[in-house]
Amino acid sequence: MQIDLPESVKEILNKFQKAGFEIYIVGGAVRDILMGRPTNDWDFTTNATPEEILKVVPGGLYNNEFGTVFTPNPDNPENPHEITTYRKEEGYLDYRHPDKITWGKSLEEDLARREATISAMALGPKYEIIDPYCGQEDLKSKIFRAVGNPNERYSEDALRMMRAIRISAQLGFTIEEKTLEAIKKNAALINKIAKERVKEEFFKLLVSPYPREGMLLLRNSNLLQEILPELEKCFGVEQKSPGRHHIYDVGEHLLISLKNCKSTDPLTRFATLIHDIGKPQTYKKLDSGTITFYNHEMVSTKIAENIAERLKFSNKEKEKLITLVRWHQFTVDERQTDSAIRRFIKNVGLENIPDMLSLRIGDRLGGGARETSWRLEEFKKRLLEVQKQPFSIKDLKIDGNDVMKVLSIKPGPK
C-alpha cells in the first residue's frame, strides 16, 4: 500500500536516522494508516534518551517522567508530536501509572507494554511494518485484542478498559472473548481512576460512530454498572401499554435515542442517554394496564445532577445537562401562545434550543415514532418567529428616550 506521510513526520524520521538513532512511528497513527484513515496524532519511539532527543530536535519540550519529548506539529498545533524513549514499566499501585520506568533496549520491548495488538505495531523510516502481535490480522478481522495477558493489562491501567470499549465503538470492532472476560473480571477497578478521566473517555464513546453498540459493550463488560448504575436499572423497565407509543423498555429506548441524536455535542448526547433515567423510580402500572411515569422528568433531573457531580462535570456542563433533562418533555401544540413559546425559550436558553430539538428527535425515534411531525415542524417555525420579538423591555430596539424624541416630549424633572 502507498503511505504518504506529512513533511514534518518525514523530517523527524530523517533527523534521527542521520543522527544514528532508531526511530519508529507507533500507536494509533500506524493503525489509522493501515485502515486508510486520516490522522493528525503522531507518536514516535526511539532508542535515544530524552536528552539525546532534544539534541536532534532542539525545539522540543521535556518536563515529564515518562521519557516523552513534545515537538511542534505544524498540521495540528494543539496536538504536538510525541517522541518517547523505548521504555519498560513496572508496578501499578494506583492502577493507572507505572511505579517504575526504565529505558528499554529494543523496539520489541517497548511494543510489549502496549495495551492492544492493533496499537502494538510500528512503522519504520523505510515504511516497513513491525507487527509482533499480529495486529494487522486483527485489523482485518475487526477485533480488539489485548497484548499478552489481558488481566495484567487492565490491572496495570484500569482506564484501558474504557479505551477498549471506546476504540471498539469508534472503529466498529468486536472485543475478543478473553479480553472481554478480563474487562468483566476487573470492571470494579475503574473506580480507582479519576472521574475526570472516566468522563473524558465516556464522552469520546458518546460521539463515536457506534455509540449504542459502545453502550452495549459497556453493559456487557460490567463497566456500566460501575460508572452509571442508574442507567443499568433502566433495562427491563417496560413502557409499552394501552395508549402508549413506546415499543422498547426504558434502557433500550435510551440507547436508541442516543443512536439517533443528531447533535455531535457529547453533553447533548449524554443528556439524550439519561433523559428518562428517573423512570424506574416513577414506574406505576394501573389496573387498566396503562403504565405511567408521572413527574419522571423531575426525578431524572435530580439524578442527572447527582451524576454530574459524581463524574466531575464543570458547572457549565452541569447546568446545560440539567436544563436539557428538565425540559425534554416540552409541549408541542399548535394552540400554544407566543407567551408560551417565549417561556420555553427562557427556560431552555436560546443557545440550547438546537440541542434540545436534537434530543427530541432522538427521543421520538427511540420510541418507535417518526423523526418529526407536522406539529414539531410548526413548533420550529414558531420558535423562529417568536425569537424576532422582544422578550422584555431591555430587548426592545427603542427605549423611552427614543419615544420622547419622536413625540417631542421634554424630559421631566430629575
Q: Predicted segment positions?
A:
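Catalytic cores of the polymerase beta-like nucleotidyltransferase superfamily
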Residues: 1-414
